[in-house]
Amino acid sequence: MANARSLVAKANNINVGSLILMALVFGSCVANGEYLGGRRGLAANSGNPTVYDITKFGAVGDGSTNTFKAFLNTWIQVCDSPVPATLLVPKGTFLAGPVIFAGPCKSKVTVNVIGTIIATTSGYATPEWFLFERVDNLVLTGTGTFHGKGEAVWKADGCGKKVQCNLPPTSLKFRNMKNVEINGISSVNAKAFHMFLVKTENVNIQNIKLTAPAESPNTDGIHLSNADNVSILDSTIATGDDCVSVGRGSNNVTVERVICGPGHGLSVGSLGKYKNEEDVSGIHVNNCTMIETDNGLRIKTWGGSDPSKAVDIKFENIIMQSVKNPIIIDQNYGSRGGDSQVAISDILFKNIRGTTITKDVVQIMCSKSVPCQGVNVVDVNLDYVGKTGGEKKSSSGGLVGALCDNANVIFGGKLSFPMCPK
C-alpha cells in the first residue's frame, strides 16, 4: 500500500486523503475483489449486482455534505466487478470533490448521473474535479448535471494568453482511455475547461449541454490534446472560451450539429505553445450553428513555436448569427513573438452563410517562415449587420472583405465580399 501511495503521489501530486483512497482503488482492482479489510464487495449479495448506488455507500444528497469518499468507495466496487457494472448517482444534490476514478477495471463501466453534482470551491491539489484515468470502455450518461461552481474562482483567473499559467480545475478530464461514450449529461459553470480529453482514442460525445457565462475565463467546452478518433455530435455549448478546441497531436476529429455560442468559436489550436508538439490532421467540422461568438471558425498557432503540421482541416455547412471574425487563421496568437513554425495546409471553408459584425469576413494571417498552403474559401455568404448586430445592411455592406498574408488562398463559388488581391 505504501508503494502504491508513493507512485500515485509522484504521478498526480494529490493530497493524503485522496492518496489513501486511490491506493484502495488500485488495490481493489487487482486483489480478487477484496474490499476494506478483506470483506467481499457488495456485488455478491446485492439484489441488483450490476448497479451500485452512491447513497448506499454513504452519499447524502443534501447539497452540503462532501460525498467524495462515497464516490470513491462506490467506484472500488464498480471497477472490481467481474461483470459490467454501473455507478448510479440518483436524484438529489451531491457535494463532491475532487474525485479520481482510476482503472484499469475488470469489466465495462457505466456512470449514470441522474442528480446534480456540485463542486467544492477549494481544496484542489490536482488540476481537475473529476478525473477518469485508464478506464477503457467507459460510458458516462444520464440527464444529470455537473456544476463546477466556477463563479467562485473566475475573478482570480489571470491566465489569458500567458505561456505559463496554472488554470483552475477542469470539471471532467479523461486521460489514457479508449472506447468512451459520453451522452446526455450537462456541465454548468466549470472553473476552467468543462471537458478535457488527453491521450484518448475512440471517443463519442453526443447530446450534451455545456454552459457558462460569456465572460467566464478559460471555460472551453471540450478541449482535445493527443486525442484520436473523436466525434462530438448534436450538442449545445455556450461558454466563455472556445466551444471546441482541438489541440496538439489530435487526429480524425468530427464535430457535427453543434450549436456554439456565446463563446470564442470552433477552434483548431492553439498549436505550437509547447516543445515538440505532435501534428494535427483530419479535423472536420460540419453542419454547425454559431450564435454571437467572438470568433467563428479559427485556426490559431503561437509565434516562436517548434516545427509541426496542421493538415486536412475542413469547415463546411456552417450557419452564423452576428459572429465576430467569422473565418480566421491567426499564426501570431499568444504573447511570445517570433514566427510560428506550424505548417498549415489543405484547409477548406465551404458553404458558410449568415451574418457577421466584422467587416473583415476572412482573415488568413499566416507565418512568414512557413506560409499557409492550399487554403480554399468557397461559397461564403455573410451579411454585415453592424458592430452590435441588428438590421441587415446592403449586400456590399461596406465590407473590407478578405485579408490575406503569407498564404496561398483559393477563392471559389459565390462570395459576399471582395477577395484578397493576388
Curated annotation (Swiss-Prot):
It comes from Arabidopsis thaliana (Mouse-ear cress). GO terms for biological process: carbohydrate metabolic process; cell wall organization. One of its GO terms (molecular function) is polygalacturonase activity. This is Exopolygalacturonase clone GBGE184. It is found in: Secreted; Secreted, Cell wall. The active site is at D241 (proton donor), H264. Transmembrane segments: none annotated. The keyword Transcription does not apply. It is an enzyme of class 3 (hydrolase). Keywords: Cell wall, Cell wall biogenesis/degradation, Disulfide bond, Glycoprotein, Glycosidase, Hydrolase, Repeat, Secreted, Signal. Disulfide bonds join C243-C260, C366-C372, C404-C420.
